[in-house]
């Protein structure tokens, strides 16, 4: 059984690799279609792997949609737990050929090769302890607060190397996600790579330091909302204000999509001295915006690591126009 699962995992990696190439070679569409068709028609259609989701919340739903809409799904079946019945039923309606809904969580585990745990943090330990796992399984925890030591304990006898923590962001549903994960795992890294950008890190300690950045999502939207509101206050209609704001933020993010250690310094330094972009950076710096960002990330990291949040005396930004 272990050999069969290993063969499936290897073929799954090959299929996902083809999909990753497909996403990057937009001008070689016909070649990639032929390549994917050849893989799909091999002895193991769609790799033969079964994915199982214990807990079908927002993140699990996004992952299922992303997986099921890949050019060639890297699995032959997806089994969903009945928890979150409305979401499970909706996914079943969208992808009836791939998805089945299990009677309970144990049925998900029994039928799946790769199991994704997507329950609420408060319930994760209880849910996992109630399940009987096997050495053949690979377990991927999507629970932000579940430590590796806890997962190793409650998912026994799954080998430690086959237990992964991953924090994806919802755009995985559209293959535009971002995922940080530990430890590196060939098949799981390839899967998340097909759903967007994946950053595998070697240790849980490093992963914890990465997690606060994912908490900037709400702030990103709030900044756009504030920009839209400013435009509306200047007399621009709501739809035009929203469309322009969204387009600008989306456009300027492209240059940082594949960043290296020097990218952001270079992008900031490219702003024309005395220009309007440089003015925004300068005034935000003078107003303490970036210091506030750093302090907030410190606080989120403390929360992730289970430490008391640093207490700081914060002064609300204010300005008065000079006469």
Annotate each predicted stretch with a short phrase.
Residues 30-40:
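Cleavable N-terminal signal peptides of Sec/SRP-targeted secreted and luminal proteins
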Residues 44-103, 107-109, 229-233, 319-322:
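NAD(P)+-binding Rossmann beta1-loop-alpha1 motif at the extreme N-terminus of oxidoreductases
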Residues 44-49, 161, 246, 250-323:
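NAD(P)-dependent Rossmann-like dehydrogenase/reductase catalytic/cofactor-binding core
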Residues 63-64, 79, 85-95, 100-181, ...:
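Rossmann-like NAD(P)(H) cofactor-binding subdomain of soluble oxidoreductases
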Residues 78, 88, 108, 124, ...:
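Small-residue helix-packing motif on alpha-helices
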Residues 150-162, 176-212, 216-259, 303:
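Internal alpha-helical scaffold of NAD(P)-dependent oxidoreductase catalytic cores
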